[in-house]
Structures are given as C-alpha cells and as structure tokens.
Amino acid sequence: MKEFVDFIGRALGAFFLFVALMVVSCDKVPSEGDEVADPDPITGYVNLSASSTANSYIINQGGSYRISAVRGNDASDVLQTARTAEVLWESFGSSLSLSAGALIKSVLYKDGYICFKTNDHFKKGNAVVAAKDESGKILWSWHIWMTDQPQEHVYKNDAGTLMDRNLGATSAAPDEYSVGLMYQWGRKDPFMGPSSFDQNREFAKSSITWPTPVASDPSTGTVEYAIANPTTFITYNANNKGWYYTPSAQMTDTSWGWTDSKKEKSIYDPCPAGWRVPDGGREGVWEKAGFNDIASEYVDEKGVYANMSSSLKIWFPNSGYLSGAGSL
C-alpha cells in the first residue's frame, strides 16, 4: 500500500517541528472540476464526495459543487437533523482584506448535501462551510481548499509521499501563500495562520471577526463543544496539557488517529480524502526519511532550507505556531 502524507509546518522558537498528515489508501481524489457520474437527482453541482468523504475538499476552478453532509470520512454517519448551510469564513491567507462572498458566493443545504457556488472569478484561498439544525446549532463543518492541485513528493526509505505544501497553503513557492492554516491538536477545523513571514506577525485577514478564545472547562473542553463552535479557540488546560478538559480514549486515540493501532483515519482528521495524519516516533515519516540526520540547513525568515544529501535540497516554510492562549 502506498502512503501519502500531507503536512503542517510549525516553528517552535529556533527549532522547527513539522506535524505530518498521512493517507491510509492509494486511492486518489477525482480531479476536482471534473463531473463525477452520480445517480443523485441534484443537477448542476459537481459531487466532490462521490468517491470518498472527508473534512476538507480541494477545488481548483470555479463552479458549482456539493459535498455529502456526513461526519468526516464516515459516509454512513449522515447529519439527519441538518436543515440549513452557511459559509462561516473565507480568507486569501494573506494580509489582503476581503468580505463575505469573495470566494464562495452562495451555499445551501439540499437533500443531504451542502451545495455551494464559487465567485464568478475563481480565486485561491480557504473557506469553511457548516451544516446547521433547525435551531441554528452547527452540526458539522468542512474546509474548502481552493488551490491548484498539490503535487506529491516521494520520500526515501518507504517513509511516505508528502504533499508539496502545508494544509491550506495555496502556493508551494517560498512566499506568504505557502504558510497555510493552523490547527489545535485533534480538532478538524482550521484557524488563521500568519499573514506574512514578518517577525511581528499578524493573523491573515478573513471575512469575519473571530470569537474571543474560551478557557477549557468541563463544558467547553469537549469534542461536542469544539464541533459546535469551530471558530472558537479553546485555550490550554494546564492540568491536561491541551484544550481537552478530561482526557479519554476519544481524545488520545481517535482525535487524529495517531495512536490507532488499526491505522484508520479518524472522523476528526483535517486532511482531504486519500490523506491522513501519520504516526510519529520511530515509525513515523520524519524518522524514516532521515530528517533527524540532515547534513546541513540554512534558516531565514521564510523557512528552513535543508540539504538531505549532496544532491537533494528541500525547503519548509516558517509557518509559526499558535500559543496555548491562541496567539501567534
């Protein structure tokens, strides 16, 4: 089985930590923008979830799209009480301001699908759409990643195949659009990354004012709260070393699937279909690929330039990190 890996790069002080996302199958996402044969009566909307469902979907051209209103990669876990849909936020991932509708001009819920249309002039960026019940409660939300199709980079020693960019990045070149999005460990929904590589960083602009972070307590430090409040950062809990208030198997074993002995993709995994969060440690991609034995490296404000060998050089963006309080 071929392994595919996506990654989020994060800088920790002067040292760089890269959290990888790995796939469990070699099945690829159908080319976004191509019509997928589907017997469903909803016409005019390309079904991005026809082959497989996920918490993130890539599109690389304008049009009308739909995704199944299910929980992550579990196509059988249908949101039975969903009644409406909403765009929660949009962003170019930079310092450029934008208003609602800049990327996605309309969204609706219909017959078990979230249906949306992009702006007439397709632009690269990120958005999150949500399904709500009759009372307006968010039942689930999905990341819409608007970018050119990421390329695959195969790493040695059967370590895996990395994407050429961070999750949410709209560029693989050494520029501000390569930074990507930020995630709290185990949560499927993204937060804004920095707007640039400047040392005095600010969050990338988006179409909303983000809620004030909340402290983790018995009511907020739960998976249920995180799902219903995808734009709210839950601050660090000193007792449990994270946002989750009460440790349990639901958090440690299935949040992103890292310690799942079956190597199955968790429904909370933030990766697109065909990709997943990988294992760490000695059997992880970084150890196998030899990242701990890099010959030499050069660091500047944009990132790390590393010599894996005399003939192979790689670059990772200086994406920064979110503190336990939710600040850059």
How should these model regions be labeled?
Residues 2-3, 19-44:
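Bacterial Sec-dependent N-terminal signal peptides
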Residues 2-13:
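Bacterial N-terminal signal peptides that target proteins for export
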Residues 1-2, 162:
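Short hydrophobic motif
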Residues 34-90, 101-106:
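Extracellular ectodomain segments of secreted/surface proteins
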